[in-house]
Curated annotation (Swiss-Prot):
This is Small ribosomal subunit protein eS17. GO terms for biological process: translation. Keywords: Ribonucleoprotein, Ribosomal protein. SUPFAM superfamilies: Rps17e-like (SSF116820). InterPro entries: Ribosomal_eS17, Ribosomal_eS17_CS, Ribosomal_eS17_sf. The keyword Cell inner membrane does not apply.
Length: 71
């Protein structure tokens, strides 16, 4: 089982994804660079957690779209 992400990471990730949906992909490395450019996060650990959560959200959205289009 994974660890639960704090609420501030989830809310920041969702806000960035809603504001800049075209900037993020399902690649963690690309999302890490995008988060560094778009948000002023001084901590590398927090930046990586936000980028990881965004990656997870993007992958989840892609699978939902795939299952909806197949049905």
């Amino acid at each position: 089982m994974g660890r639960v992400k704090p609420k501030y990471i989830k809310s920041l990730a969702r806000r960035l994804l809603e504001t800049y949906p075209d900037k993020f992909t399902d690649s963690f490395e690309e999302n890490k660079k995008a988060v560094a450019q778009l948000a002023d996060i001084p901590s590398k650990t927090v930046r990586n957690k936000v980028a990881g959560y965004i990656t997870r959200l993007v992958k989840r959205l892609k699978t939902q779209e795939k299952t909806e289009s197949a049905a």
